[in-house]
Amino acid sequence: LKFIPCLNRVFLVAFNKQIAEELNARGLPSNATAKTLHSVGLSALKRHQNRSKVNGNKTRYILGDLMGGYNLMDDELRKTYFKLLSPIQRMVSLFKNFGYGAMLPYPTKDEVLELAAKYSVELPDEMDSFLKLLAETFEKSTKQLNIIDFDDMLYLPIKLNLIFDQSDFVMVDESQDLNPIQIEIVKKMIGERGRALFCGDPHQAIYG
């Protein structure tokens, strides 16, 4: 950092909150700051709509509503709900991480199956009804802005084309673990004449 001119704004992308706090505690130069991408996305969302509340169970509640309300389900329907909950949560999360509906069109049936196989998501046998419910859950999740989950902190700012604070130099550690939506955020954080440095090991990549 000492070789970067003091007039240049420097942003360090931290892999998690603890690392960001440690970097800032060390006493970064006045022109540098360290945050997670989730923090960056949440800041952009708050500028757009300050009333959003964070709830990690967002998909769970949406699925329950679409199936008639959890408290109104009989035992059989409740069993179906719990059978569908995990794969729908996983697939909705993957859709957001890859930018479907924001950077890419909604995935085809073949793309859903390919994504599920690649990330070991076990899908139910009743494929047509599952895909319909998955699409409805995803659509409602991406339109519900008053409640957001951790995936939304990254996904919604891109879908809504929100403005990010830009820096002259962006440094990204553990870049092999970035998913497509995170990469898009980093690109939007780079100033017009800015640069980025990505440090990572492709052999440890989560998203390939």
Where would I find each of the regions flagged by the language model?
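Conserved SAM-binding loop
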Residues: 1-3, 171-180
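Conserved phosphoryl-transfer catalytic core
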Residues: 41, 51-81, 193-205
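Conserved helicase motor core of SF1/SF2 NTP-dependent helicases
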Residues: 7, 15-19, 35-38, 176-208
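Short, polar/flexible loop-turn hinges at active-site or ligand-entry regions and domain interfaces
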Residues: 7-9, 29-31, 47-61, 70-75, ...
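P-loop NTPase Walker
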Residues: 1-53
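Short, well-ordered alpha-helices that flank and scaffold nucleotide-derived cofactor binding pockets
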Residues: 2-6, 25, 155-162, 184-191
